Amino acid sequence: MAMAAAAVIVPLGILFFISGLVVNLLQAVCYVLIRPLSKNTYRKINRVVAETLWLELVWIVDWWAGVKIQVFADDETFNRMGKEHALVVCNHRSDIDWLVGWILAQRSGCLGSALAVMKKSSKFLPVIGWSMWFSEYLFLERNWAKDESTLKSGLQRLNDFPRPFWLALFVEGTRFTEAKLKAAQEYAATSQLPVPRNVLIPRTKGFVSAVSNMRSFVPAIYDMTVAIPKTSPPPTMLRLFKGQPSVVHVHIKCHSMKDLPESEDEIAQWCRDQFVAKDALLDKHIAADTFPGQKEQNIDRPIKSLAVVVSWACLLTLGAMKFLHWSNLFSSLKGIALSALGLGIITLCMQILIRSSQSERSTPAKVAPAKPKDKHQSGSSSQTEVEEKQK
């Protein structure tokens, strides 16, 4: 990490990780003492506690980096957001798609009840992953034999969730890269499937499970399409922490859950059809550098995230001053060494967070030959998933 970047990132890291540990501690106490007595009371409290941490990342996007998120949606869809449970299905275009979702959830008043289906390793990320675990995010191993029951039970637990929630599901299964697109195109060409140009072939098992298990209490599916204008550099966590702006376009279309077909095969085909339509929509975006013919909705950046960050900064600064005055930490070599160690740990944690978000570090998808597939085989790749559904 370059010295100039470190000079900016480390202070932000100190604020984020120390406040995050406080939040994690509060979440743990509530989990142990309150959740056994009342799960919904725990959820209501955790929603407020978790939001005080997640708003710091919203502040980084909105105020520190000045990322501009432009939302395109019809009035009916936009007015429903935040007032109902929803399954959110999105293409995985950038390194911060999950943060874009948080921004939209925050604008809609449901940031504290935003959920997602994520890979299991994410829950071990310092502070942020722990807060997600306490908030009932669903973590999968990318092995359907193990994940099927985990996903089903996790989805069914949301039946009595006390506030409107969004559950995000990235059905492509991995972030978009040119290498993965090429693999998907080669597979589609050999399997007589529509050849994608801007998206990957969706994995439909998780989507089918989500629809089957939640259609009785989740009324809507928000189909989100993320695109980066040609005039804007792609947003990354490193760019955010360095205060470098970007522009992100998001198109949102609401589908009523009751309008989806009943059978699993038809639900899977519906999902694939939506990604074919999403691919065509992205073609139009590439040509026009916007979503043509779509209404742009106003989502001004709110003051709440700024107020939270200022409050955390004041509290931690005051606490640090009192601690240093009491401990005389810098009056000995041991104290200086401990301080240096703490800074080193925070720097390492920031690097882990940044590196975990980088799409190019993901393993490129492998092209599987078109052949019949054992129904009991794991659906861990988009190509083999399509094979099973196309039998």
UniProtKB/Swiss-Prot annotation:
GO CC terms, sorted: endoplasmic reticulum membrane
**Stretches that traverse the bilayer:** 3-23, 306-326, 334-354
**What Gene Ontology molecular function terms does this protein carry?**
1-acylglycerol-3-phosphate O-acyltransferase activity
Q: Its membrane topology, per UniProt?
A: Multi-pass membrane protein
- Point out the signal peptide segment: none
Reactions catalysed, as given in the entry? a 1-acyl-sn-glycero-3-phosphate + an acyl-CoA = a 1,2-diacyl-sn-glycero-3-phosphate + CoA
Compartments where found: Endoplasmic reticulum membrane
- What pathway or pathways are given for this protein in its record? Phospholipid metabolism; CDP-diacylglycerol biosynthesis; CDP-diacylglycerol from sn-glycerol 3-phosphate: step 2/3
Residue numbers of motif HXXXXD motif? Answer: 92-97
BP term (GO), one = CDP-diacylglycerol biosynthetic process
Q: Cite the entry's keywords alphabetically.
A: Acyltransferase, Endoplasmic reticulum, Lipid biosynthesis, Lipid metabolism, Membrane, Phospholipid biosynthesis, Phospholipid metabolism, Transferase, Transmembrane, Transmembrane helix
Q: Does the keyword Membrane apply?
A: yes
Region Disordered: which residues? Answer: 358-391
Pfam families listed in its UniProt record = Acyltransf_C, Acyltransferase
This enzyme's EC code(s): 2.3.1.51
Notes on the domains = The HXXXXD motif is essential for acyltransferase activity and may constitute the binding site for the phosphate moiety of the glycerol-3-phosphate.
User: What does the protein in this record do?
Assistant: Converts lysophosphatidic acid (LPA) into phosphatidic acid by incorporating acyl moiety at the 2 position.
The entry's family comment says: Belongs to the 1-acyl-sn-glycerol-3-phosphate acyltransferase family.
- Name recorded for this polypeptide: 1-acyl-sn-glycerol-3-phosphate acyltransferase 2
